[in-house]
Curated annotation (Swiss-Prot):
NCBIfam families: pheS
Record protein name field: Phenylalanine--tRNA ligase alpha subunit
Native source organism of the sequence: Salinibacter ruber (strain DSM 13855 / M31)
Cofactor note: Binds 2 magnesium ions per tetramer.
Pfam families (alphabetical): Phe_tRNA-synt_N (PF02912), tRNA-synt_2d (PF01409)
Alphabetic keyword roster: Aminoacyl-tRNA synthetase, ATP-binding, Cytoplasm, Ligase, Magnesium, Metal-binding, Nucleotide-binding, Protein biosynthesis
Family statement: Belongs to the class-II aminoacyl-tRNA synthetase family. Phe-tRNA synthetase alpha subunit type 1 subfamily.
């Protein structure tokens, strides 16, 4: 009789059930009280030796459960098929519109900046947000006592792995310069977008997290005039042909000479009718930076630019408070 269970299981699995009538016939054939195959085997348990009865009964109960599962599965399938063929749907009726999201204004501005830069011949490279002290400071000609290395200006990660140098949340995208020049030989023309972090006070025009785009161009005979031409081309494409720029001498450890660039921002509440908004720092790559990555400063020159995406988005859209970008206010985001 144990072999009969195996044979009956094969029959149950092979049986086709394609209608409610076939499901009822299947039930009667295998589970029917008077003539079902499985109840008939239950009646024969008493003919088995006592030691075989428990195992035979267990297997027979499992077979009974499987037969019932086949019936339940078939009924559920047939019900779904019946529902699918239910009342007709008028496809000409207007649909229900779900909530439509929008691209964040910072993402829009960043995408536009990178699109313009691609047209100017710059490729794109991304670097890590957690940087070593070497890439973030030392290789960029920051002296050991530079204020940027202090805890009040930089987020340092606690407990670096033993034998490794300190790690920080990058304070600028300039470490991308170092990583690219370590991996490539000139000529190099690249843009490095990314988030950066500063341990500084939050105000209407500064935040502890913001976005930058770094530009690096290294080749023979690169000049400051080429740098200014690229920045004018970028500003006009982004803000319009009538944009007003101002270059101011400045200081950065990794460029010499250095400059900051401001854009005139019309402001009706200002006594002067507007104000200058700083959007980027720039300059010619310092020879010490080239030497840190084994690039010959006697042969190559280059320029570097670090621009703030938030500031540019504020100028493009007339936004007067940087903090609103991070409030996730749908009323604000829906405008873009």
């Amino acid at each position: 009789m144990p072999d009969e269970i195996d044979q009956l299981r094969e029959q149950i699995e092979a049986e086709s059930i394609e209608s409610a009538e076939e499901a009822e016939a299947f039930r009667i054939k295998y589970l029917g009280r008077n003539q079902g195959a499985i109840p008939d085997l239950f009646d024969q348990i008493g003919d088995l030796p006592p030691e075989e009865r428990p195992e035979f009964g267990r297997r027979l109960n499992a077979l009974k459960d499987r037969a019932q599962e086949r019936i339940d599965e078939a009924k559920a399938r047939l019900e779904r098929q019946e529902q699918a063929g239910g009342p007709d749907i008028d496809l000409t009726l207007p649909g229900r519109c779900g909530f439509k999201g929008s691209t964040h204004p910072l993402t829009q501005t960043l995408d536009e900046i990178l699109r313009i830069l691609r047209g100017l011949g710059f490729s794109t490279h991304e670097g890590p947000e957690v940087e070593t002290d070497w890439h973030n400071f030392t290789a960029l000609n920051f002296p050991p006592d530079h204020p940027a290395r202090d805890m009040q200006d930089t987020f340092f990660l606690e407990d670096p792995p033993e034998g490794t140098e300190p790690r920080v949340l990058r304070t600028h995208t300039s470490p991308g310069q170092i990583r690219i020049m370590e991996a490539q030989t000139p000529p190099i023309r690249v843009a490095v977008p990314g988030r950066v972090y500063r341990n500084e006070a939050i105000s209407y025009k500064s935040f502890c997290l913001f976005h930058q785009v770094e530009l690096l161009y290294v080749d023979e005979n690169v000049t400051m005039a080429q740098l200014k031409q690229v920045l004018y081309s970028l500003a006009r494409a982004l803000f319009g042909e009538d944009v007003t720029l101002r270059f101011r001498p400045s200081y950065f450890p990794f460029t010499e000479p250095s400059a900051e660039v401001d854009v005139w921002w019309d402001d009706e509440d200002s006594d002067d009718g507007g104000q200058w908004m700083e959007i980027l720092g720039c300059g010619m790559v310092h020879p010490n930076v080239f030497e840190s990555v084994d690039v010959d400063p006697e042969r190559y020159t280059g320029y570097a630019v670090g621009m703030g995406v938030e500031r540019m988005a504020m100028l493009r859209h007339g936004i007067d408070d940087i903090r609103i970008f991070y409030e996730n206010d749908v009323r604000f985001l829906d405008q873009f």
